[in-house]
A protein has these predicted regions:
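Conserved catalytic core of the tyrosine transesterase superfamily
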Residues: 1-210
Length: 210
């Protein structure tokens, strides 16, 4: 309108278009997650890595939370894990059957460390570091014929896949340990088609009659 002479001023002068945040990691597809985690362990630490990665994806942990997990963090025979997240807030999370199985396999073959309660240990019997696991995952993803994957992508995939199947944003907020729902909304960027599908399948007044 301003360009064509209908207005004597530009109403959008000084307005800057908001930047789109592309800094969030991309979620892997369920097929890519299966491809990544389908590797057959050949060494002791392959078993550890499989348990670690299965736990990340199963429970949506931050890498810092996962490396801090102890045997005493689990309850009900590895069915739930207690973690301490940001702000020193504790939360209890379910552990999936694949993660539970992988953890038990790791415990069966690992060498006992000086601190028997530490779950994920290195070759010196010490707690592993986030940097070490990032490097291990990077190499594993390339070995599996994939683009580089980092631990946070598994957490992001956990949230995205759970939201796509359930649509329960509030529960996912609790599981991720987000203090604000807006953080979870940004974190789990679903497209409009996915949101419409969830709405159609879940809302009482949106369900189609047979």
């Amino acid at each position: 309108m301003f360009k064509n002479g209908f207005l004597s001023f530009n109403p959008f002068e000084g307005v800057v278009a908001p930047k789109i945040n592309d800094s969030l990691p991309k979620a892997l597809s369920p097929e890519d997650v299966n491809k990544l985690l389908s590797f057959e362990p050949k060494t002791i630490f392959d078993f550890r890595d499989k348990a670690f990665l299965e736990l990340l994806y199963s429970s949506g942990l931050r890498v810092s939370e996962a490396i801090s997990v102890n045997l005493s963090s689990f309850e009900s025979d590895f069915t739930f894990v207690r973690v301490v997240g940001k702000g020193n807030k504790e939360r209890m999370l379910p552990v999936g059957k694949y993660a539970k199985y992988a953890i038990q396999k790791w415990l069966d073959i690992r060498e006992v460390s000086a601190d028997k309660d530490v779950l994920f240990t290195n070759k010196f019997g010490k707690r592993i570091t986030a940097r070490a696991m990032q490097e291990r995952l990077y190499k594993l993803s390339l070995r599996q014929g994939m683009s580089p994957v980092n631990p946070h992508m598994l957490r992001h995939s956990f949230a995205t896949h759970l939201l796509e199947s359930s649509g329960d944003l509030r529960s996912i907020q609790e599981m991720l340990g987000h203090s604000s729902l807006s953080t979870t909304q940004i974190y789990t960027k679903l497209n409009f088609q996915q949101l419409a599908k969830i709405y159609d399948n879940s809302h009482p007044h949106a369900k189609k009659e047979n």
